[in-house]
Amino acid sequence: MDNHAPMYPSLAKTILVVDDDPSMRLICVKTLRAAGFTVLEAEGSSESLKILATHQEPIDLLLTDLMLPTPDLQLTSTENPYPRVHGHDVIQRAFAMKKTSRVILMSGLSYHERKGYQAVTDHVPFLQKPFSVETLMQLVHEVLASAPLSFDDSAAKSTANPDVRWYG
């Protein structure tokens, strides 16, 4: 066995980190960059959807918070292709765009508070906040080394109505 072989798969991977909490986003971004990953960051779903739609290179992993702020009302005179939605909808839209096939969903909500999102959280890798840097890195490496997810499973799909046009 070569003692100089990397312990994990190639770190030449791109990760998109989405979290509205600046301190949590900073911890994730700094940790992942220090490990050699290329890291894109977004403070919310609108920004993350724009990155997913416009970034030219593959995004190997989407690390997103479950509870991203959404507006109470999202109506204006022009359609917004990058609406503010929760993290589970960001995942569903990322898969629909075929921009990533690996995700980690994170949240500070307890298991009981997440019950309404169980269809999603039971089908994707989940990171409970607060978490250690070691736990983050271990899960990131496990997910990148695993088979890509498929969102053909209707239980894991977003509860968002695809016929609803988002404005705002």
Listing of model-derived features with the role each one plays in the protein:
Residues 1-16, 22, 26-29, 46, ...:
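Non-catalytic signal-transmission and effector/linker regions of two-component phosphorelay proteins
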Residues 19-20, 65:
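Acidic di-acidic motifs
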Residues 30-35, 51, 119:
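Alpha-helical interaction/dimerization surfaces of two-component signaling modules
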Residues 41-61, 65, 69-72:
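Acidic, metal-coordinating helix/loop segments flanking the phosphotransfer/catalytic sites
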Residues 50, 72-100:
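Short amphipathic alpha-helix used as the core "switch/output" element in two-component signaling
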Residues 62, 126-127:
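Two-component signal transduction core modules
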Residues 67, 82, 110-113:
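Conserved phosphotransfer active-site motifs of two-component signaling proteins
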Residues 106-107:
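Hydrophobic/aromatic residues positioned on beta-strands within the core alpha/beta folds
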